[in-house]
């Protein structure tokens, strides 16, 4: 959520910056609402002052024994109270209208973000590794997994439906090995604290990280909306679309000491997404699932440190790919392809041989103070009384299923077996090939 002053005193400049990412801010409506708000604010304050002044006169009239005057003043005070209540209600309604508009406004892109309309105008900044040239016909991960009876899409369809998977034997073990390897790397070498978090979260948490109110259709929600347990209404819960939600919300409504910053947290969780806008896309294989595992990286920093932290966090995700010896490229998203709450985002795209292209495997973003303002996540500098908003960052380190896709396809052999990357073998009890 943007600073409200940007939508009051810097409206035209803010609209211009938002236009860079293809968002049209309704300047005229906001300006009119703000003028009405100011007028009502003044009226409310005047009515409050009049009521307070007249209320004091009641005691003075009674002290003089003029009860008739006291009654008349009390009637005036009651009328002023009614007017004040009406003005306050109108002011609250106006403020809610302004807030509703503000909640639909995305973050402002950083000046370093390239201009562009969509993903075709993202800018490649690095390419690591060289895709192998195979002397045999390359198979995709679906064929490789089904040949080895390690990926069972048919059973998943029977149990749950499309966009789910059952993994078996060494394929399930490889999936587990990947997540263990990622967690060990991030906790032992990159300085993150491992977290175990709920997979069901409340609306306040989803609001804090920006999924609500705008992206509710992308989530899986529990039903009914509320239920009574011991006379206490429970809020509707939703399955997490990413561990970013529960992990980042650890700092909601808190004030962190400057000495404890930055906070660096990681969590391995399943993620659940409805893929509401992805009908017909990536219907084959593990690329786009309703349920998938991911190791998430979250950093909570001081404002002046967040851009350097984005480079660091992205580097931590890159290290996973490098140790797995998977060719990838790094792109900075253009203004038209950025996520709703992002100030700046890097995508890491891994080489997928069967598709002969790079596919996203990690997205690393600096959210600036956008989430922090919603969450009231703050820190206090040493010697200062007033707390400041933190900056929040998050990124995949990595998506486990897509990493598995990359390993199956990049490490396939002519006979259909899969070589296990060297760094994973200790997690596989020394197994060198599967399939």
UniProtKB/Swiss-Prot annotation:
Key words of the record: Aminoacyl-tRNA synthetase, ATP-binding, Cytoplasm, Ligase, Nucleotide-binding, Protein biosynthesis
Keyword Repeat: no
Biased composition (Polar residues): 49-58
Pfam family, one: Seryl_tRNA_N
Binding site for ATP: 273-275, 360-363
One GO cellular component term noted in the UniProt record for this chain: cytoplasm
The name this protein goes by in its record: Serine--tRNA ligase
Organism name: Aliivibrio fischeri (strain ATCC 700601 / ES114) (Vibrio fischeri)
Gene name in the database record: serS
